[in-house]
A protein has these predicted regions:
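NTP-dependent nucleotidyl-transfer catalytic core
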Residues: 1-289
């Protein structure tokens, strides 16, 4: 909603604006779902490396099941190092093109996108581009080679990193990790590749990133890397618009009674019911006064 408001304001001021949802569809969250699904249904053809037939058109899970699988897997990752390792391997193999995992990914995306379209339409939020991390993936190899050739990408403790610290920094700015020691690309890698893609497709004067303010350091690293490497022009503006979180009584991001993150749809429904009850209550008070 904040991004939609900023887009409309810039459009009113004369900018040609493009809203991009930038789906997080290529990272560890996908590996977690794949790993948890394999625990629950190991007999599925997606997990047979020797399978050569067509994969089912129908997903082996529903939206409600998918919404339960991910938080379960996310919690298990913190408690079970062996499961966490399997999720990392699944993420890497998905990114490398393993057919069965790509088929699961297609199921996840089809179900998730249908739900997202429905929710955003209800909020009157509209994106001109429905791209994600997966769309930036083809740009990564050439980008990495270019960063190596220019001396920006260096090896450190088995990982490929881009040092972005500057003299005068008042706080430590760690290197931007490009490729982890296990060979997997991460959030920063795809964010940089997305900037490459956007510069080639649109050459924008300004890019606004509207996310949780807890990602401030991440975007500081990515934006510095983009400018230092020449991925963007010196005059191209990169800005992180960090917003707060809705917190519970403990001061931490609000969760449901079950301990998971509340879905936006459920939050809107609860807020609507609360306001409706208050309106009725105020009407009763006014009529009895």
């Amino acid at each position: 909603i904040i991004g939609e408001a900023l887009k409309r304001l810039h459009k009113f001021m004369g900018y040609d604006t493009i809203g991009d949802i930038h789906l997080g569809d290529w990272g560890l969250q996908m590996g977690l779902i794949i790993a948890e699904l394999q625990v629950r249904q190991p007999e599925l053809c997606y997990f047979d490396p020797n399978y050569t037939g067509e994969y089912p058109k129908e997903a082996p899970f529903t939206l409600s099941e998918l919404e339960e699988i991910y938080p379960t897997a996310s919690l298990k990752k913190k408690e079970d190092p062996e499961f966490a390792e399997k999720a990392h391997i699944a993420t890497f193999e998905l990114q490398q093109g393993r057919a069965g995992y790509r088929a699961i990914w297609n199921h996840i995306m089809r179900i998730s996108l249908a739900d997202l379209h429905r929710i955003y339409d209800a909020l009157d939020v509209h994106y001109e581009a429905w791209l994600g991390e997966s769309d930036a993936d083809p740009y990564i190899p050439a980008m990495i080679e270019d960063l190596k050739a220019k001396g920006h990408a260096v090896m450190s403790e088995g990982a490929l990193v881009f040092p972005v610290a500057e003299e005068g920094d008042k706080k430590e700015i760690p290197p931007c990790i490009l490729i982890k020691s296990d060979g997997a690309a991460i959030y920063a890698t795809t964010d940089l590749a997305t900037i490459v893609q956007r510069m080639q497709d649109h050459d924008p004067d300004k890019m606004l990133y509207v996310t949780d303010k807890r990602q401030n350091l991440h975007f500081e690293q990515v934006f510095r890397a983009a400018h230092k490497s020449g991925i963007v022009k010196a005059e191209t503006e990169l800005e992180h618009v960090g917003h707060g979180t809705m917190n519970g009584k403990d001061g931490k991001p609000f969760k449901t009674r079950e301990g998971g993150v509340m879905r936006l749809e459920r939050l809107i429904a609860e807020m609507t019911d609360f306001v409706r009850a208050k309106v009725v209550e105020n009407q009763i008070v006014a009529e009895s006064a």
